[in-house]
Design a protein with these regions (language model features):
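Conserved phosphate-binding/catalytic loop of the ribokinase/pfkB sugar-kinase fold
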Residues: 61, 87, 97-133, 138
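Active-site-proximal loop->helix
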Residues: 66-78, 97, 102, 106
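Conserved beta-alpha-beta core of the PfkB/ribokinase-like small-molecule kinase fold
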Residues: 132-202, 212, 220-222
């Protein structure tokens, strides 16, 4: 069956250490817990979309190791097509997550994610071309983004995380950009992240993206800037957040889900804010991602107007 959503991105083994505070340079601190789990922005977004009821295919890479086999199994358990997940001659990617309740600081070693390039996307060009939505991030080589931009015919969403410079001709080929404050600053070459909504909007104007931009603002919600329309502030849902690790990834998946459901950008961002807020009420990355039934108890899969 043809997937509705293709995610081209990273697959990592997450090692999450619970700390009271992030250590300073040269300092050692003790962790109060260690959790190993599947992760990577690509995996998180794929699982998030699948749990919202979408048919999802993953294009990525893992190593020929226990972590890689565990990641494949985790995706298959979610009903995700892993035919596009290559086995690389290098270890599965690793992310060390320092969790400082509820925020996280993350260090990534790409490992097998380094082979997710133009050639790999080319092998799976038919799936990318035929998908109704394609989600990308920046934990894989830039060539993968170029290939998606040249191949996809559906809605393309780029989450430029982690914050790296993305050439204008690449980012402009994506319909929707979903940066956070820091990533937005990196895209425009600013030396500091924007504080106020006015500063965020000014940076979006500087970015001059021909498509839509949705800037995620954590507890402040999101600023939605549709192409050719006035910006709209979308408030965050009030929840007792315990872990924000996968909030941005679930937001991106839910935004695409809302657009595919027929919502406009603002409606879809409201739905994404709802999904992201729910994500923060549970611990972990993949483990925290909600199902549609968790959010719509009366059977309405995407209550965009609620």
């Amino acid at each position: 069956m043809t997937p509705e959503v293709v995610v081209v991105g990273s697959l990592n083994r997450d090692l999450r250490l619970t700390v009271d505070r992030i250590p300073r340079s040269g300092e050692t601190v003790s962790a109060s817990g260690l959790v190993r789990s599947p992760g990577g922005k690509g995996a998180n977004q794929a699982v998030a979309a699948a749990r919202l009821g979408r048919r999802v295919a993953m294009v990525g890479a893992v190593g020929d190791d226990d972590d890689g086999r565990a990641l494949r199994a985790a995706l298959v358990a979610e009903g995700i097509d892993v035919g596009g997940v290559a086995t690389a001659d290098r270890p599965t990617g690793t992310a060390v997550v320092l969790w400082e309740r509820p925020e996280s600081t993350i260090v990534i070693e790409a490992g097998a994610n380094a082979v997710v390039d133009e050639a790999l996307v080319g092998v799976h060009a038919a799936a990318v071309r035929d998908a109704r939505a394609v989600l990308c991030q920046c934990e894989t080589p830039l060539g993968a983004l170029r290939a998606v931009a040249a191949t996809a015919t559906g809605t393309t969403v780029l989450n430029p995380a982690p914050a790296v410079p993305v050439p204008r001709e690449v980012r402009d080929a994506f319909r929707v950009l979903v940066p956070n404050r820091f990533e937005l600053a990196t895209l425009v070459g600013a030396t500091h992240e924007p504080g106020s909504a006015e500063e965020v909007l000014a940076m979006v104007r500087t970015l001059d993206h021909p498509g839509d931009v949705v800037v995620t603002l954590g507890a402040d919600g999101a600023l939605v800037v549709p192409a050719g329309s006035a910006p709209v502030a979308v408030p965050a849902r009030a929840v007792d957040a315990v872990d924000t690790t996968a909030a941005g990834d679930s937001f991106c998946a839910a935004l695409a889900d809302g657009l595919l459901h027929g919502g406009d950008l603002v409606e879809s961002a409201r739905w994404a804010a709802r999904v992201a807020a729910s994500t923060t009420t549970r611990h972990g990355a993949v483990d925290s991602l909600p199902r549609a039934t968790d959010l719509a108890p009366e059977g309405t899969r995407i209550p965009l107007h609620s």
